[in-house]
Swiss-Prot record:
Disruption phenotype: Reduced growth rate and delayed flowering. The lineage of its organism: Eukaryota, Viridiplantae, Streptophyta, Embryophyta, Tracheophyta. The gene is 5FCL. It comes from Arabidopsis thaliana (Mouse-ear cress). Optimum pH is 8.5. GO terms for biological process: defense response; tetrahydrofolate metabolic process. This is 5-formyltetrahydrofolate cyclo-ligase, mitochondrial. GO terms for cellular component: mitochondrion. It is found in: Mitochondrion. ATP binds at residues 60-64, 206-213, 254. Residues 1-48 form a transit peptide. Contributes to tetrahydrofolate metabolism and photorespiration through the regulation of serine hydroxymethyltransferase. Prefers the pentalutamyl to the monoglutamyl form of 5-formyltetrahydrofolate.
């Protein structure tokens, strides 16, 4: 199912421009923040000082707090319905079926993330099939925003870490290092991303650790070095996580997404996503 295609003043331009701004788009948002949480209208990377950056980080904290409360208040039955709808959309999508390699997050219930268990199970269900996809999942390396994406073949490859979040052991059952996607010889086609809040201009707000933005930048550098096409960046989102366009503050370190998968379907954001979806 394809959702409404809403375009902001070119997302490509946003990726390249040194000016970070928050346009007012005449579209009805799924969720509106109060005026007090809306970000500063314009920021230039050439004139930002620490005070301005601190202001953006403060705005991010306010948005995170608002969205966390909304997620916590979600009815469990509604959450289950949205989990099923989102995963069904992904599993039936041509861009998912055709991908040969991908990075995907392992959902954590305590973080109120969109469930990915059916997606992962489908990928790992037929390891010897011709349609098998090569799957890489997150392994947090340290507390300094360093994360790796390691290859797994079975759900049994996952163990709970100190925060009770499933992740791959860095070595397999035979004692061999797991393949790191940043050292792989072949590119991946797709990232399935988590997040705390999103808008239809491609802005993504994480949980504040910087792990995904740091990793995505590294993979983009790797792809550029190898001459590979960038993978499609697709985020999964419950309804309360989709904010009014321009409500999410951004910095030069924030990586934009290509598309959203919502309970209502797919929302392509970039021209590439429109072509693929």
């Amino acid at each position: 199912m394809i959702g409404a295609r809403v375009f902001c003043i070119t997302t490509t331009a946003l990726r390249r421009s040194p000016i970070f701004f928050f346009p007012k788009i005449p579209t009805r948002p799924v969720f509106r923040l109060s005026p007090a949480t809306r970000p500063i209208v314009a920021m230039s990377t050439t004139s930002k000082n620490q005070e301005e950056l601190d202001s953006i980080f403060k705005q991010k904290r306010v948005v995170r707090s608002t969205v966390r409360k909304s997620l916590k208040a979600m009815d469990p039955s509604l959450r289950t319905q949205q989990d099923e709808a989102i995963q069904k959309t992904v599993l039936e999508a041509p861009w998912f079926k055709s991908c040969k390699g991908l990075c995907a997050y392992i959902s954590c219930k305590s973080l109120n993330e969109v469930d990915t268990s059916k997606i992962l199970s489908e990928i790992l269900q037929h390891p010897d099939s011709n349609t098998q996809k090569k799957l890489y999942v997150p392994w947090v390396e340290d507390k300094n925003s360093n994360m790796r994406m390691l290859h797994i073949s079975h759900m049994e490859d996952l163990v709970a870490n100190s925060m009770n979040i499933l992740e791959p052991a860095p070595v397999d059952a035979q004692g061999n290092d797991r393949e790191d996607v940043l050292q792989a010889d072949e590119p991946i086609d797709l990232f399935i991303l988590p997040g705390l809040a999103f808008d239809r201009c491609g802005r993504r707000l994480g949980r504040g650790g910087g792990y995904y933005d740091t990793f995505l930048k590294r993979y983009q550098d790797r792809a550029k070095e190898k001459g590979w096409r960038y993978p499609l960046m697709v985020a999964l989102s419950y309804s309360p996580q989709i904010l009014e366009d321009g409500s999410i503050p951004v910095t030069p370190n924030d990586v934009l997404i290509d598309a959203l998968v919502t309970p209502s379907g797919v929302v392509p954001i970039t021209p590439r996503a429109t072509e693929s979806m």
